[in-house]
């Protein structure tokens, strides 16, 4: 799936599923210098369990456009914009390595979103 945030393309592996607002959504965040590929087995498993799953490529990583973001805070703000663009209302965030820090910052800044 490719969508735009601030006029830059964002890539997300979505396992070919159609987003369903009625389902719980899980966003998977990779670590520094990685991409959605680190979640290639996990995303399929979670989708098979009935969740909407988005394994995102952060800016400057994988297939997403833009420069790498400079701080965990910037990444959390960017993630909030992604959530709004997609229209996610029922959300869990899983992170690997740096992705965990982004998930923690996001939940601290936007507790009503998770």
Question: Predicted regions span which residues?
Answer:
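Membrane-interface segments of envelope glycosyltransferases acting on lipid-linked substrates or membrane lipids
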Residues: 3, 32, 51-52, 57, ...
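Active-site loop/oxyanion-hole signature of alpha/beta-hydrolase fold enzymes
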Residues: 48, 58-94
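Conserved hydrolase catalytic core segment
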Residues: 89-114
């Amino acid at each position: 799936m490719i969508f735009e945030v601030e006029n830059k393309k964002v890539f997300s592996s979505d396992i070919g599923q159609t987003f369903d607002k009625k389902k719980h959504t899980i966003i998977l965040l990779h670590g520094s210098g990685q991409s959605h590929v680190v979640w290639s087995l996990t995303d399929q498993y979670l989708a098979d369990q009935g969740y909407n799953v988005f394994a995102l490529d952060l800016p400057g990583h994988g297939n997403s456009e833009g420069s790498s973001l400079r701080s965990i805070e910037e990444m959390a703000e960017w993630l909030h914009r992604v959530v709004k663009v997609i229209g996610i209302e029922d959300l869990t965030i899983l992170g690997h390595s740096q992705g965990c820090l982004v998930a923690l910052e996001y939940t601290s800044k936007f507790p009503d979103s998770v």
